[in-house]
Amino acid sequence: MTNLRKTHPLMKIVNSSFIDLPAPSNISSWWNFGSLLGVCLIIQILTGLFLAMHYTSDTMTAFSSVTHICRDVNYGWLIRYLHANGASMFFICLFLHVGRGLYYGSYMYLETWNIGVLLLFAVMATAFMGYVLPWGQMSFWGATVITNLLSAIPYIGSDLVEWIWGGFSVDKATLTRFFAFHFILPFIIAALAGVHLLFLHETGSNNPSGLCSDADKIPFHPYYTIKDILGVLLLILTLTSLVLFSPDLLGDPDNYTPANPLNTPPHIKPEWYFLFAYAILRSIPNKLGGVLALVLSILILAVVPFLHTSKQRSMMFRPFSQCLFWILVADLLTLTWIGGQPVEHPFIIIGQLASILYFLLILVIMPITSLFENNLLKW
């Protein structure tokens, strides 16, 4: 008799995705981040659900409802900090996952890659709206500054901003709609992640060598289920350590002050995971130019597959491209640092140079270097 997991309509979907899935035998720990992102999403949805039971999306009570969660709700402080720091873990896994894709040429699976870029945008939008909900100083001013950027769009800009605000400033209507979107988007992200997996399983996983691995596949279970469980345990260990020992390490002290439209904080800055994009935005003196650079800093990922000029897929055997990849990583870390600094000398010029280097590396230097490496191999 055939095993039930292979014949049952529902179980065979799970079976073909997580049990009998043929996987390359040589994928490293860099391939763990997909499953870790799934775990992060589940943690965020569950903690978010319990927070939503106690949160009120009204400008008068939002801040106090968060205080109430931390003080009066059983383990409310734990749920709140798991959710806040879970977002940071989510973005760490996201950045490493995207970095892995860039390094090993996973972007050659076009559909999977493009849905991944769409997922990145969706997660960033969700995180931004979630940051507004506690209604602290940085929540309010962050929302004001970022939504105001849309006014740079010619002709419809100012109308668009007022439409998003639901009035003439960030107020009750804005908070309520941000809460609604923040609640629904994670479920849309989960659906998109399903489509992401669907397209990935059409082609099969890439591997570190970038070569076809059809001749050497192993079943996902037990090999990679065990490997993923190790990753999940390390993720949970890191997250719980962060939550229990220094829950406010990655937050902004300004957000413990209730929102006040009459008092602007000295340095308005987003959460750490948006600082690189914020630095690119600030490095251009023109408003519309800055907004375009901000969007393009992420959208540029969708162009990467078309800039692949190498005869080899992975960077595993391409030392020059490897050097450039790590320069790109260092550049992004520099941008992250600059994004958190005040707008003054020397930070302005460092930010501008780092922004130029970011776009130059991806659009010009890396494709040319790949062609040079092809010539070295006389291909």
UniProtKB/Swiss-Prot annotation:
GO-annotated molecular function: metal ion binding; ubiquinol-cytochrome-c reductase activity
Keyword DNA repair attached: no
Needed cofactors: heme b
One of the GO biological process terms: mitochondrial electron transport, ubiquinol to cytochrome c
Cellular component aspect of the GO annotation: mitochondrial inner membrane; respiratory chain complex III
Subcellular location: Mitochondrion inner membrane
Keywords per UniProt: Electron transport, Heme, Iron, Membrane, Metal-binding, Mitochondrion, Mitochondrion inner membrane, Respiratory chain, Transmembrane, Transmembrane helix, Transport, Ubiquinone
Annotated heme b b562 binding sites: H83, H182
Domain of life: Eukaryota
Record: residues binding heme b b566: H97, H196
Family: Belongs to the cytochrome b family.
The name this protein goes by in its record: Cytochrome b
